[in-house]
A protein has these predicted regions:
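Ribonuclease/tRNase effector modules and their secretory precursors
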Residues: 1-95
């Protein structure tokens, strides 16, 4: 997969969450739970993906531009998000 991001946003994300967008290459898409981010009327479709990086759950907000994933945010999942992921990912695999 190809990734891109705004460098200013990359640094503000690191300051806020302590996570570098470069870590997106380790995002485990095979175990990803993806939902559309419809909270606001964005200029393009946005998605929130929950997946592990090195045995820790992360949340990536991104948009697709052709065959490139444009990272908007990447951070460690909080406890509520971990619980959401566990319950929903298990339900997906049960079907």
């Amino acid at each position: 997969m190809k990734y891109e991001w705004d460098d200013t946003k990359k640094w503000s994300n690191f300051e806020k969450h302590g996570v570098d967008f470069c870590d997106a290459v380790f995002f485990n898409w095979q175990h990803a739970l993806i939902i559309e981010d419809a909270r606001n009327d964005y200029a393009e479709d946005r998605f929130n993906a929950f997946a592990p990086i090195n045995n820790r759950l992360y949340v990536m907000t991104y948009t697709l531009r052709d065959d490139v994933i444009r990272v908007i945010s990447l951070r460690k999942a909080n406890k509520r998000e971990v619980n959401y992921y566990v319950s929903n990912f298990q339900n997906l695999n049960a079907n």
